[in-house]
Amino acid sequence: RQAVEGCTGGPILGYRAPRWSLGGAPGGGRRGRASGVVGPALDVLVREGFRYDSSLAPIVHIGDPDWPRDPYRIDRPGGSIVELPPLVGRRFGVPLLFAGGWALRRVPNRVLLRAIEARNPAGAPAVIDVHTWEFDPDPPRVRLPFMYRLAHYGGLRGYRAKLEELLRS
């Protein structure tokens, strides 16, 4: 955190866990693949002065589909933190994380725009995350199992143009 603050010249106010690794339920419940870790992790973020988190995905694979899809405040013993859930949409009737990575690279912009526009009337943000390495259309390749390779490298070619088009829309 200090290294990034040193580079930007400003405070880092938000956090997003790598690979949506918090999982679990906001109160430390039993759903998700990392149950019981959420409460203590949020306590650390509050203690460290973070104002918001965007690590709790409201879908079954990496979080809990019952979590809110709009921003909400989570009260902890040491204070509170705002949770900014990532953009979730539906594709072929299945709720999917549209926020970043393979989905943001692969889902057509018209589908992403529909998901974003559905949030606009309520004034809710469409939270997406962009990884800087994704702007390299030909990054160094590492040996990975097929599904990991597909998720990691799929859709990199043309991604920058796709994102620019999405932002212009």
Residue ranges of each PLM-predicted region?
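An active-site-proximal structural segment forming one wall of the substrate-binding cleft
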Residues: 1-7
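Short glycine-/small-residue-rich flexible loop motifs, especially phosphate/cofactor-binding loops
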Residues: 2, 42, 164
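Acidic-residue sensor for enzyme active/binding pockets
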Residues: 5, 83, 134
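Active-site-adjacent pocket scaffolds in enzyme catalytic domains
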Residues: 10, 17-129
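Bulky hydrophobic/aromatic packing residues
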Residues: 11-14, 141
